[in-house]
């Protein structure tokens, strides 16, 4: 398998990937369970597709940026530039609609806002502490969407969320005490 040239130049990136991947997967799973919970109360099928895809791409990009040792300030600047471009595109279209907002009950709008915050945040997860911030946002999304439509699916999403969150917090604590190549 041939890797990109800039990735092979980093010393020890495979060992770092092996150490960081379980934490990224566990927090991604916790966030995705929240999006699934929101998708179960929304009648818009595109909402889960768009938010899930963007969040997954954000997690992958964050992991690659972390392996490449890109400074956090550069990532925030990049995120700000992308947000500015997207904002200008929205102004050009003279629309303020967010995918999913038309098909969601008014009581779910805060959960929808948290879901989009989770999607934006997924592009900046370059430290272990930032990764753990996915858990409270996901819990808020699950709680807000679970009060609107309590169904058996929500119990399953919460169970998977709880297991993934417990693993992420435990693994984060493990990484604090084990010397890791950073």
Task: Indicate where each model-derived feature is located.
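Linear, non-domain "peripheral" regions
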Residues: 1-182
């Amino acid at each position: 398998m041939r890797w990109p040239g800039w990735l092979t130049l980093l010393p020890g990136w495979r060992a770092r990937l092996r150490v960081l991947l379980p934490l990224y997967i566990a927090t991604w799973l916790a966030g995705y369970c929240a999006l699934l919970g929101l998708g179960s109360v929304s009648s818009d099928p595109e909402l889960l597709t768009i938010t899930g895809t963007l969040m997954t791409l954000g997690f992958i990009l964050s992991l690659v940026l972390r392996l490449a040792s890109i400074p956090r300030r550069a990532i925030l600047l990049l995120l700000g530039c992308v947000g500015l471009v997207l904002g200008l595109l929205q102004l050009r279209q003279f629309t303020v609609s967010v995918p999913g907002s038309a098909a969601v009950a008014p009581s779910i709008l805060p959960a929808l806002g948290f879901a989009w915050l989770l999607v934006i945040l997924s592009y900046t997860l370059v430290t272990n502490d930032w990764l753990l911030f996915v858990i409270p946002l996901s819990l808020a999304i699950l709680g807000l969407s679970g009060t609107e439509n309590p169904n058996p699916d929500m119990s399953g999403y919460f169970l998977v969320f709880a297991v993934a969150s417990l693993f992420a917090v435990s693994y984060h604590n493990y990484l604090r005490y084990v010397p890791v190549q950073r």
